[in-house]
Amino acid sequence: MVDIHNHILVDVDDGPKSINEAIELLKQAQSENVTDIVATPHHLHKRYSNDIEKVKIKLNELKNNSEIKKLGLNLYVGQEIRITDQIIEGIKNKEIEGINESRYLLIEFPSNEIPYYTNQLFYELQTMGYIPIIAHPERNKAIVQNLDLLFELINGGALSQITASSLLGDFGNNIRKLSLKMIDSNLAHFIASDAHSITNRPFMLKQLFNDRKLKAYYEELESYLKNGKLVLTNERISKQIPTQDYKQKKWFGLL
């Protein structure tokens, strides 16, 4: 399985603080049948800055570790880029790259809002040949209150990534239900762990397929994982037309 969003690099953000913590986290990833991992430390965040060269250096430290080599995992370079008006400048200055040098950029919103310039920025990124992947939109308060905001962005060409623990109910039943609405309305394209540590949001991809409440969604979840592989090889993601089915369906009492 491919995981396109996690925090495995040592002492660069709110992920592992030591090489031993990183090793334990990667062992846990292996136990979840994860084979390919994109390291996506926070960048342009108010507390963290990780330009792509720094990410490459820190990732090579993991790749060259003898214990990690034994795990046989494939590790790739990425960034979780906080949305700001500095993204295009960062691309031009070669501080930002797509996942594994692809056209795909993982972009995070603030937790409470979608900035007013988001549509224009996403349009400009797409004219430059990049495709924004919105990280965990189901946890954004503005989207929770109004799913039309996400529909507009997806309809405009963006993609989105749901966090596995959202579907498993770790952020509460409302977030779980919203995540399922996104799937039913073709507003999701990837599933990822957003792993930080073995105790705080570990890798949980295999657990999705052990949750019988998600059985009706196994096919979609498998396709989202396959999409992760397409990102690594910079191939086009085939997506279904987004709908507003979430406006008609009654979700009372679901799950």
Curated annotation (Swiss-Prot):
Transmembrane helix in keyword set: no
Protein task: Required for the biosynthesis of type 1 capsular polysaccharide.
Taxonomic lineage of the native organism: Bacteria, Bacillati, Bacillota, Bacilli, Bacillales
Family the UniProt entry places it in: Belongs to the metallo-dependent hydrolases superfamily. CpsB/CapC family.
Annotated protein name in UniProt: Putative tyrosine-protein phosphatase CapC
GO MF annotation: an example: protein tyrosine phosphatase activity
Biological pathway: Capsule biogenesis; capsule polysaccharide biosynthesis
Pfam families from the UniProt entry: CpsB_CapC
